[in-house]
Amino acid sequence: MELSYQALRVASQNREAEELRTEARRKNLLILIMHYLLQEGYMDSANSLEQETKISLRRFDVCDNVDLETILMEYESYYYIKFQKYPKITKKALDHDSRVQSKPRSAGKLRRAGSNSTQGLPRIAQQTVLHRPVSGSYFRTHAHQKALSRENSKQENGGNSPREASEIGLNVSAISKTSGEGGQTRRRQVIDFRSMIQDTIKGASQEIALNSLNCNPDPSERLIKPVGAFIGGNSEMRELAAVISRDIYLQNPNVRWDDIIGLDAAKRLVKEAVVYPIRYPQLFTGILSPWKGLLLYGPPGTGKTLLAKAVATECNTTFFNISASTIVSKWRGDSEKLVRVLFELARYHAPSTIFLDELESVMSQRGTGPGGEHEGSRRMKTELLVQMDGLARSDDLVFVLAASNLPWELDYAMLRRLEKRILVDLPSKEARQAMIQHWLPPVSNSSGVELRTDLDYSTLGAETDGYSGSDIRLVCKEAAMRPVRKIFDALENHHSEHKNLPVISLDTVTTSDFLEVLAHTKPSAKSLAEKYAAWQKEFESV
């Protein structure tokens, strides 16, 4: 089993390294195109390219002596040396109607098989199949086999065979034994798979750690597939897809898993649904297929949205931050179309995560509103339920993460489709103590002014019972403001413009100061704790 675990890890790390290579290759190609357009004066085309890729390509520049024209010239020279003729780069296009009907090429996919109308490359040998080399040893083995075959053909023909042209202008000589001795040696050889796997793990991990491809996983620099390859020539779908694409989260929230204090069960389930299926797809098949829906419910300010920000930062997925204003339209029929386009775009950009915040505003119980429910709202809810059913029956890596402060108002059909329902409760005493220590450390100098504290964290953790994480942050901020307010009078009375400001020295924040702030800052959702616990007993799914 140990060997199998190592093999899974190797496959995961190699897949991550290959994804980094592909991402870097696509980004480098777009930067080369942008550089060429700007160099040739195609300013409007360069601006359109920058808007469609959703990243600022002008922040990057090509290296010295590298441009698109030089790369094309070098390829033509290489092709001529290898095949004694220049490559055919372009061909006459089809008529306009046929070209519109043809499907655009999927972005990010490398297609090696050419069309039948394109002139193929000359065949080197009828029985030889060329593959992309993966290491330097391939060149030595392949060159040695070709040298042996040429030597045997010369001996059979009496040395009168015509001289073959060198592929790249290099003469390669064999350094190993004859083929017969080599075959006997290979039959006696014992292959140490364990050492091979360990070497592969070490090389892959070093490659990823060194980040030699300059591929930063920052969401703001991630390439987004062009919408044109998804919608084709339908103008209505293009407009709806553009509306949804604006909610693809490209900023970096800079929230890590370790930054979230507590919420261990929620973090574990999110990793099971988003992170692990991408890293170890061999494990998530059949009955072990990943979760498609997760509901985070609990009092406001307990970290539900913060957990979604961690997903956007840590998980290498396309993150759709959807609100009610995105998928609700005043025009008849547009709401359900927006929902359908949302899920189709999520499949197109897979792996992806759809985050629905304040879910009760979109999926409240049907037929319970005063005066009956509007027809458009009912159709939109039905379409959302149908699309989530389609996710459950497919193998697409699309995950729905929903958050709600009022789970008892959600439609029961939506609860069934959200397979996991996690209560994000008020923090425990240990979590509250860690939060206070995080926001008010003994010494902090982040704003340029040194602030010192002398707090009994254990006592304050017990005194803040019923406070949410957001409430505790508010209390810490108010406690830190108390010594700052004392120096406002001195700063306002300093009228001389030529004299320097006096040295600012803030008083130490003590435990008594913190307790005084607690007396005037009450928790926001303490009264709802029992209601959440009662709903959890009836609908919990962990």
Swiss-Prot record:
It catalyses: n ATP + n H2O + a microtubule = n ADP + n phosphate + (n+1) alpha/beta tubulin heterodimers. It is found in: Cytoplasm, Cytoskeleton; Cytoplasm; Cytoplasm, Cytoskeleton, Spindle; Cytoplasm, Cytoskeleton, Spindle pole. Residues 94-126, 142-168 are annotated as: Disordered. It holds the Pfam family AAA. Keywords: ATP-binding, Cytoplasm, Cytoskeleton, Isomerase, Microtubule, Nucleotide-binding. Residues 114-126 have a biased composition (Polar residues). ATP binds at G298, P299, P300, G301, T302, G303, K304, T305. One of its GO terms (cellular component) is spindle. Severs microtubules in vitro in an ATP-dependent manner. This activity may promote rapid reorganization of cellular microtubule arrays. Belongs to the AAA ATPase family. Katanin p60 subunit A1 subfamily. A-like 2 sub-subfamily. This is Katanin p60 ATPase-containing subunit A-like 2. It comes from Xenopus tropicalis (Western clawed frog).
